[in-house]
Amino acid sequence: MSQYQRLLLIINPLLRQSPALNHAAAVAKASGASLHIAALIPSLDILSLLEEGDRKVARASYLQEHRDWLKDQAEKMQGRGIEVTTEVAWADNMRQDILDHVTEMHPDLLIKQVQHEPVLKRAFFTPLDWRLLRHCPVPVYLVGAQSHALPQKVVAAVDVGDTEPSNSELNDRIILQASALALQCNAELHLLYACDIPAAFLADLGGGLTLSELTRELRKDLETSFLKLAARFGVPAECRHFITGHPVSALSEFAHEHQIDVIVMGRTQYGSLEKLLGSTTEHILYQVPCSILAV
């Protein structure tokens, strides 16, 4: 995986204490990549109550206030040797505007702060972060609230339970992206698989074996596959983690216990059920304090 060349950071300028600013600056500095910061502002309905002339003045004044602030942030980054450009604009369709920026820029990473949404709201509306995970053509780096600006511990979360060629290719991409991030940030690289063996699946296997015997056999096969994958990419033994449990809860517990800064995960193709319920990567956003890099 080559070194980063261009990074795109999307921010809401109303959230001026966003950790995403520091994360993007730190990764850009470490990698030598250029950084473009797009401050996209959702349309303010209250401005529609003003007369047209007053509305134009208010919109221009509002944008200028945020431009001045962002210019100050950019100058501080430039003082640290970071190549940075900025823009402030209204966003009538946030998802599409972000994707348009990605299409135009072709960045190596799209960086954005995790936007937490209440469970009830997620039941009726697909969160913006989920939509970006599903439709963004480049890796999406969603910054959590509690991790080092420059990652110190990166974990590649793979799935060795699916033997389809497409999943094997995804595992490779996950590890390569995690390796690239860890290398450029001088961070530790860990490899993890959360082994979750559903009883319903085992019950269908038959063969005269007991459930516990089937569990042991399947676990042994999965661990062998995991160790082969780790060996192929040269992951040291002390950085290999074969853990048991549901992926969301197991990853969350591991991230807390080991103070992980970034979890690198894959994005899958969605059927109707997955679109409704959300994937492991989408749900983990709300369970861990660290950042997620989805590839």
Please describe what each predicted stretch is:
Residues H36-A38, T85-A89, Y141, H190-L192, ...:
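General small-molecule cofactor/ligand-binding pocket signal
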Residues I111-V114, P139-A145, L293-V295:
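Short beta-strand elements of ligand-binding domains
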Residues K112-R131, V262-Q287:
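Glycine-rich, Arg-bearing micro-motifs that act as flexible, cationic patches
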Residues P127-H148:
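Short, structured interface segments
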